[in-house]
Each structure stands twice: as structure tokens, then as C-alpha cells.
Amino acid sequence: PSTIWVRTNSSNYDWLWQHMDAMMKEYTYRYGKHHATERLTHYLWEHPKNITHGDFTDPPQCMPEECKGEDTVLAYQTYYIIEKSSFAKWKRREIPEWFNEKNSNLESKNKEYIGFVTA
């Protein structure tokens, strides 16, 4: 789904290139070295010749159904909490506020659901 989405139009392509560039900078900040993928960024700077121009569309939500929602950012935050929290780490960064807040809310909802918290 993501490869189809990025080829849909130049705005999606630009967004993904900028996201990739930011990820490379973040990797260098956290680990003090350059990711091997970074050597490809200059090759990917220019749009593919046959890509159409168009307005940005939200990236596909490639995740379990229970994480999906109308807001793509919120859906991916939920996905990280449900599916990735057991091994998520933030080297040289504070844990994002959204992660702590949503994780606390999710734990409360799960406890209510399985009967640990009574009304």
C-alpha cells in the first residue's frame, strides 16, 4: 500500500522524501553515525519522470484494524502503543508526551474491559 501511495502524485513523493531525510538526521543524532540508506537520498531527490502532480493525500494505515481511525497520526500513535510499546526506546530523546498519555489511557480502558476497575 505505501509504495502505491507514494507513486500516486508528486506531493506524496515530496512528503515521503522529507520524512526520509528527517529520519536520516534523527538516526545520525541518536547514534552518531550515518545510516547506509542515506547514500541514496540524492538519487531520490528528483521526482520519477512519469509521476503526476497532485495534492497530498494521507498515507495508508498499514496496521491492524483495531488501530486504524480517521486521523492517520493518531492511528499510528495507537499502533505504536498497542503493537510496539514492549520494545519502543527513545535513545537520546525523552519519551513523547502522546506515548505516555495515551498509554495510560489505554491501560485504564483495558483494565476496565477485563474487570480490574469497577464503576
Model features per residue range: what roles?
Residues 1-119:
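Sequence termini and other peripheral, non-core segments
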